Amino acid sequence: MSRFFAGGGSDSDSESSSDSEVVARPAAPQFTFSDEEEDVKRVVRSTKEKRYEDLSNIIKNIRNYKKIKDMSSMLTSFEELTRAHTKALPVITKVENGVTPRFIIRALAELEDFINMVWEDKEGRKNLSKNNSKSLGTLRQKFRKYIKDFDSDLKKFRESPDAADDDEEEEEKKEESESEDEQHVAPAAAKAVSFKKEVKQVKVEKDDDESDDSIDWDMDSDSDESSSDEETQYTSIRERFLKKAEKDDGEDAENKKEKKKLQKDSKDRLKKKRAEDDDEGWEVVNGNRSTSAEQPKMFAKDAEIDVNVVINKLNEVMAARGKKRTDRKLQIEFLRELRTIADTHNLGDAVAAKIRFNIVSAIFDYNPKVSEPMKLEHWSKLLEEIQALIKLLLANDDIVLSETILEENEEYETAPYKIRGCILTAVERLDDEFTKLLKECDPHSNDYVDRLKDEVTVSSVIEQVVKYIERLGNDTETCRVYLRKIDHLYYKFDPNVLKKKKKELPASTLTSVDEMDRLCRFVYAKDQTDRLRTRAILSHIFHHALHDNWFQARDLVLMSHLQETIHHSDPPTQILYNRTMANLGLCAFRHGNVKDAHQCLVDLMMTGKPKELLAQGLVPQRQNERSLEQEKVEKQRQMPFHMHINLELLECVYLVSAMLLEIPYMAAHEFDARRRMISKTFYQQLRSSERQSLVGPPESMREHVVAAAKAMRHGNWNACSTFIVNKKMNVKVWDLFYEADRVREMLIKFIKEESLRTYLFTYSNVYASISVPYLAEMFELPKSKVHSLISKMIINEELMASLDDPTETVVLHRSEPSRLQALSMQLSDKVTNLVDSNERIFEMKQGNFFQRGGNQGYNRDRQNYRNQNQNQNWSGNRRQDNRENRGNRNQNRDRDHRKQHRVEFEEKAE
């Protein structure tokens, strides 16, 4: 408004001119016009500038959204960025020769770091809103898919992230040149420059030159003076818009040269000042720490370095351990510098061991959350420090590192050296960190394999600690370190054990079974706590079962009586017990002990949660069955993937064992109403298959077992073995066994035997006699084996028959009742049970109603009546008497007797 009305005094006028400016304006022209329309030229931008500007604006928005963690807006901006980059691809291909600009790669790298940081912060993710949480998952998924095309560019950027972006440098130079051109325009044109341009000009000059404010103020005052002079020098509008003289152009060129010279001089003065500041010893202060006094100071240049000075400085550094504002990374750096100083002045191995032990402790403290694993760079440094510390302790016999030594009793100058600390605790924590690192990795990725390679290093560290602890002679610590060694040994299969059994190796060869036996026997003898002994026994059983030492493993289980007291143990020990019983069941199955295998696995499989009981994963639960805290604790107990037991193999062994036991039992007790299920899980699978209206060919492992069970019920061993042993089942289950061919042969032999028993139970009522050679031919078994099976059935009274040796036949003496007869007997038994229960209910009601003295006489008379009725009517055959006693006549008579006795009882009571 001030540009158009001479007398106006608005805010814009005050901004464009100085506050102290007082100008007398002529009264003739009541308004003036701005030169902005004439002086500002239209700028034609190239396609590259347009596309790059769009990308820059989107990247700027993404950085703003990162500050406030607005995931929804960030997802929208990322989609806009992908579309803008697609539009800019022709320009990039033409101008940049297909190389993606560095500022785009920088933005993608920053976004990747931000997404990973937010995703790893599990507590922070829980606090996000539902919309932001959903947008984070979608953004992470889309970004990981989109970033694959920029892998090589990102890798190069990660190598040198601090390098400046080429496009940004060009833009800065361009802006600087534009700002110089704009600030040196003629006084009449300077008035038309917008406020936005002025701010940008000052900012560029501040960033580039960081000069004093006086230069800018001089420039502003010059421009204001020129504008005021311009407004006063014209008396009419016509003179104001006339073309300027040529001499003005010469004056403007001279003004430009002078101002450029002033700017160059200011830059030189600034560089000189910075150089002087660097010479004076200025240093950059970390903004995270409030004061520099919190940092422990190293020694002065002229200080005398000895053992006491170094130990005091070490105590000073470690005194800040655990405090709120302690920089853990800086603390580790100070300790390493202190170790370097101690090595330089040759202060001895004892001081070096003390410092290294404190470095190990500081690395452990670097990770504040105990439930989360440490970073990989800290893990590698931790391994190096512990290996160097143990090597130092083993090389010096006169250094004793123990937690029983008090701080005032430490000795660093004269042998024997005494240091307070516990190397065993450090190694135990190292082992726990290794387990957490494994559980954090994806088990199906190469990262897990890379981390698993560190187990060789961890095992060697434990071996070295075993040597050191054995040298100290402390039985308690020896048991603890032995158990750590057992934990890394018990689940590993050693083929030399089986070769030694087959006498392919000399008897003096030491195997893992011999090593386990030595370690566990020491723990059995010296341990003072039940937990270590229990875990040693379970690990010993597991290792024996893994190498098919069935009898040794079984005897250890029976002698230890762990199954009676294991429910009092801690959860990790109970998990180890479940793993041991599962492996023992597999061992029993490999040895052909089907019943023992079923007994070992039944408690584990009947719950329906073998995955959780073996700590191999969590099954999704219904609402409110497991809280977040419980789920977090249970996830910490999970076993690493390489220690898992194949659940499909375990379930198949259990179902096959149940089939070999349940099908003959069902055939033998088909019409028995009091039949009990041997395996509830197998019975449910069988019943669910029978309820299906249409059953197709088997596909899964369970369907194969159910189809085999149905074939066995009819005595068809060939179809049963085909369903159990085939190409698909071999790949899924049987090829996972050691010596799989032997297991398959044993399984087919058992199927033949149990199919024979099922056939005899099912069809014995059809035959009067059966030929033994015919049975041997039908089931492809030797005659001796058929003879043995039938003899056992006759001895156990499972089959009412006799063997005729001259004719080699089985003579059946009594046939089983028909189906109608069996159902009739079941009905009579159920009716009998119903009547007895009704009588008991009636007696309870009568006893509650009549609570006076005549109650005893009534019960006595009723009991006499029942005894008399039993003596008269329940003699002879039980089934025939049951049918007669349940007739209408007996029911009426019993009812009359009850009424008569009730009347007599009431008369007595009155």
Swiss-Prot record:
Signal sequence, start to end: none
Principal location listed in the UniProt entry: cytoplasm
Compositionally biased intervals (Low complexity): 865-877
SMART domains registered for this protein in UniProt: PINT
Bias (Acidic residues): 162-181, 207-232
Localization per record: Cytoplasm
A GO biological-process term: formation of cytoplasmic translation initiation complex
InterPro entries: EIF3C, EIF3C_N_dom, PCI_dom, WH_DNA-bd_sf
Cellular component annotations (GO), alphabetically ordered: eukaryotic 43S preinitiation complex; eukaryotic 48S preinitiation complex; eukaryotic translation initiation factor 3 complex
Compositionally skewed regions (Basic and acidic residues) per UniProt: 195-206, 237-268, 878-910
Biased composition (Gly residues): 1-10
Keywords for this protein: Cytoplasm, Initiation factor, Protein biosynthesis
Family: Belongs to the eIF-3 subunit C family.
Subunit and interaction comment: Component of the eukaryotic translation initiation factor 3 (eIF-3) complex.
Name assigned to this protein: Eukaryotic translation initiation factor 3 subunit C
Gene symbol of the encoding locus: eIF3-S8
